[in-house]
Structure formats: structure tokens, C-alpha cells
Design a protein with these regions (language model features):
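Generic leucine side-chain signal with a strong bias for well-ordered alpha-helical environments
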Residues: 74, 208-210
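Conserved small/polar residues in nucleotide/adenosyl-binding loops
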Residues: 199-208
Length: 210
């Protein structure tokens, strides 16, 4: 059998009734908190636009992606809820594209914040929504928990950006390191006195196991 014929035999079957049940369980565990569906990596192989449309039909209206192209694709395919780009943008052209498609941006540093603010000013855009990203141990990007003054000074300097959320990512949730996860949680909540619409930290592993 030829390799291309083997590829044609690969099929992914998704049972929507099982997905529906999983959504209900997660909503129940969230205990009234909003659920953000993170759809990176082609929705973890489930198909970005089809899966997002299914989630939207089930009342999910918050989405997280790690690629600007995915955020734009969701908008162009009828996803009307909040879309958060969870990785930083430093290029004015990319930021302009995100603003044009009503994408919520992530601010991971003072430089990142200023580029977004300057781009919005150039576009004469009154308010761009953004979430602050805090590094509680993941080590990729984000303000450190010890940088409270820098965070405050950065936020106060913004004229065209409205901070609507603050988030971080559990570093060791999957391995169930309960002590370390709780330490991350404490470090994060220490910075969450700012009144914002969304404060999000949990991943599905912590929701199910902690």
C-alpha cells in the first residue's frame, strides 16, 4: 500500500454528545465563573473553526488562542465572543490587525504595553482591551510577581489601552505538584487587587484535580 493511501485511512471521529457532556461538567466545576476555551494547536487537533462554532452554540463566549492568524480566522468564521491572544505582539502591523478584528491583546512587559498603546494612538482608536500576563513560574513571558511597581507604572502610563483582565499559567498542574501549584496561586492572587473583568489562572488539570 502506498504512503498516500495510508494517510487517507486516518480518521478522527469526534462525538459531539461527549463534548457537550464535558462542557456541562466544566461549567459545573467552574461554579459560576466564566469558562475560557483555549484553542491553540488547531484546537488541540479537533479543528479550530468547527470546534469553536460548536462551543459557541453551547454558550461558550470566551476563547484563547496563541496565534494571531487563529484569532483572525475565528472572527472571519462567525465567532463573536471575546477572543484573547495569549501571546505578546510587538509588531505594529500585527497589532493593527488584532485591533481591526477586536482581539483582546496580552501585555507581557512594559515594552509590549507601549507598542500597543502607541499603535492604538496612531490608529486613533480610543480603547484597546488587553489582559496583563503574569509569570508565576512558567518562565516564557509575563511580568514577574515581584515587579508590582513596574506593573502599576506601566498600567498608569497607558492612554489607549484598557486592562480588562489579568492571567497566568500553572507551570506544574499536570504533574499534580500541589505545593508548587498552590504557591503559584498565592503569588498570582497577591497581584489581583485591580478591579478587572477577567482574572484567570486555572487550567483543566487543576480544575479536575485540585
Amino acid at each position: 500500500m502506498k504512503p498516500e493511501e495510508l494517510e487517507d485511512m486516518t480518521t478522527l471521529t469526534i462525538k459531539t454528545n461527549a463534548l457537550d457532556n464535558n462542557i456541562r461538567i466544566i461549567k459545573r466545576l467552574a461554579n459560576g465563573a466564566k469558562v475560557i476555551a483555549v484553542l491553540k494547536g488547531n484546537a488541540y487537533g479537533l479543528g479550530l473553526t468547527k470546534f469553536a462554532s460548536f462551543l459557541q452554540s453551547k454558550g461558550i463566549d470566551n476563547y484563547g488562542v496563541t496565534e494571531l492568524s487563529d484569532a483572525v480566522t475565528l472572527r472571519r468564521n462567525g465567532i463573536t465572543g471575546n477572543i484573547l491572544l495569549m501571546t505578546p505582539l510587538y509588531n505594529s502591523e500585527d497589532i493593527t490587525t488584532a485591533i481591526d478584528h477586536d482581539i483582546t491583546l496580552s501585555i507581557t512587559s512594559t515594552d509590549c504595553a507601549h507598542v500597543i498603546d502607541e499603535t492604538a494612538a496612531y490608529m486613533n482608536h480610543p480603547t484597546v482591551h488587553a489582559h496583563l500576563c503574569i509569570d508565576t513560574g512558567f518562565g516564557r513571558y509575563g511580568f514577574l510577581c515581584s515587579e508590582e511597581k513596574q506593573i502599576a507604572d506601566t498600567v498608569q502610563s497607558l492612554r489607549h489601552v484598557r486592562i480588562t483582565g489579568i492571567f497566568s499559567h500553572f507551570h506544574a498542574a499536570a504533574c499534580r505538584n500541589e505545593y508548587y501549584v498552590k504557591k503559584q496561586f498565592q503569588d498570582f492572587t497577591h497581584l489581583c487587587d485591580t478591579p478587572v473583568s477577567y482574572t484567570h489562572l486555572r487550567a483543566h488539570e487543576t480544575e479536575l484535580h485540585l
